Design a protein with these regions (language model features):
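Interfaces and regulatory segments of ATP-dependent nucleotide/adenylate/phosphodiester-chemistry enzymes
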Residues: 1
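Conserved PLP-enzyme active-site core in the AAT-like
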Residues: 4-24, 31, 41-54, 62, ...
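Acidic, PIN/NYN-like endoribonuclease modules and their adjacent C-terminal/linker elements
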Residues: 34-38
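Short glycine-rich or small-residue beta-strand-to-loop segments that form or flank ligand, phosphate
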Residues: 54, 58-59, 85-89, 323-328
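Short beta-strand to alpha-helix junction loop
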Residues: 63-67
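Solvent-exposed, charged/polar functional surfaces in cytosolic regulatory/catalytic domains
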Residues: 74
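Conserved C-terminal alpha-helix-loop-beta "cap" of PLP-dependent enzymes
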Residues: 306-422
Length: 423
């Protein structure tokens, strides 16, 4: 480890150096995937003739927005879809997911959640939580069924096959959300898709791809998914895109989603890009390398805190399929100190002390450490957690590995300063 200019205890520095050396093999795999995915993105830029004109925006209706339409093509090729809908008007990943669900589902259709209960923020959209009559899927006559994971770990393929019969959508959440189940590899997503389609050839496999883009060499569309959804302030925005989301997959499904986002009959043909095209293109171009930095930060953090005596999910030596790591910190005091330490290692608002609050869409208080250039950007180093057992911090991001590593060490130092670590 190179010289550290922060006031980190020598014992912590020694442990961090050991942890980093033990991560070298994982780092090599991450770099190899980043090189492959970087070439894949570059080829999409070249094949779709991205020009300087594509970097400019439009106003008003946005008719003939060359940059907007080219971005759709670049995303579609790189992610393996027929078409894509990439828009800065998606306010977050949940909005993009909601648009896709409402775009594809109709009254009387059944949504089958194949990986247990989805994110907290989707519960009210579906209608399994919140007030009746608020405009949820269930309010509009959509039925909801759920297949829980076996022992909260593995998909229940037999139950998926049974319930897929008659369902319109097989919904898969790639990342773990605020749970401790493993995130799903692209291979496992493919097995779920195969199982659902064998039971019901007409079923639409929809994947919440948030936090997973460019972690592996393949994306879910290459293994049987029909449509994937994500956020531009996570992986594919590369730390540059300031807002937005995407929907990518089968052209007919993307068009339905576009009609939902704008209006029926206009779809993708309208929607000005303002000055967002350059940020979205540059961010997507950089995304594979930014994801690699976030993955290295995650692997290092897990190994470092394992050496400090904490359990991590995934463990430091396990193959990644998203950028999230869970560090089980055992109690509220440890959890809050960790998040406050991450904040102290942030480039923006490092002097701010995060506290738990009642965050919209969640049923318990949440603490968030996110001193980011883009508010809520999960590709930048951040940590958040609901204040409830098992008091796990969900760590993600780090657009440069050296600063991500420093942030993790400062989190440990904050715990040490408060007498919460024994070294």
């Amino acid at each position: 480890m190179n010289e550290c200019i922060f006031n980190i205890d020598p014992k912590l520095l020694s442990l961090a150096s050991e942890a980093e050396n033990e991560c070298r093999e994982m780092f090599e795999k991450i770099d190899s995937n980043a090189e492959y995915n970087g070439q894949k993105v570059l080829k999409a830029f070249i094949d779709n003739r991205v020009s300087e004109g594509c970097l400019k925006g439009t106003t008003g209706y946005g008719y003939g927005d060359m940059g907007r339409d080219t971005i759709d093509k670049v995303f579609a090729q790189a992610l393996g879809g027929e078409d894509a809908l990439v828009r800065h008007t998606f306010v977050n990943g949940t909005h993009a997911l909601s648009t896709a669900l409402f775009g594809v589902l109709r009254s009387g259709d059944t949504m089958l959640a194949c990986t247990g209960k989805p994110y907290d923020t989707l519960e009210e959209i579906i209608g399994i939580r919140g007030e009746k009559g608020s405009g949820s899927l269930i309010d509009f006559g959509v039925k909801y069924e759920q297949v829980d994971l076996v022992d909260e770990l593995c998909p229940d393929y037999d139950e998926i096959a049974k319930k897929a019969v008659g369902a319109k959508i097989a919904y898969i959440q790639r990342s773990r959300g605020y749970s401790l189940r493993p995130s799903l590899t692209v291979e496992i997503i493919g097995k779920i898709a195969e199982t659902a389609k064998k039971a019901n050839p007409d079923i639409i496999v929809m994947v919440d791809n948030c936090y997973g883009e460019f972690v592996e060499r393949k994306e879910p569309l290459s293994v049987g998914a029909d449509i994937i959804i994500g956020s531009l302030i996570k992986n594919p925005g590369g730390g540059i895109a300031s807002t937005g989301g995407y929907i990518c997959g089968r052209a007919d499904l993307v068009e339905k989603c576009a009609d939902r986002l704008t209006c029926v009959g206009m779809g993708k043909e309208v929607g000005c890009s303002l000055n967002q095209n350059r940020e979205m293109l540059l961010g997507f171009f950089l995304a594979p390398q930014m994801v690699a930095s976030a993955l290295k930060t995650s692997v290092f953090a897990c190994r470092f805190f394992e050496k400090l005596g904490y359990k991590t999910l995934p463990e430091s030596g396990e193959t990644r399929t998203d950028i999230i790591a869970s560090i089980l910190l055992e109690n509220e005091e440890n959890l809050v100190a960790f998040c406050q330490g991450i904040q102290k290692g942030s480039p923006v608002d490092s002097y701010v002390t995060p506290e738990a609050w009642d965050m919209p869409g969640y049923d318990s208080k949440v603490i968030m450490a996110a001193g980011a250039f883009t508010m809520g950007a999960s590709i930048e180093l951040s940590a958040d957690a609901p204040i409830r057992p098992p008091f796990a911090a969900w760590l993600q991001g780090g657009i440069t590995y050296p600063t991500g590593k420093a942030g993790v060490m400062l989190a440990a130092q904050e715990m040490y300063n408060k007498g919460l670590l024994r070294i």
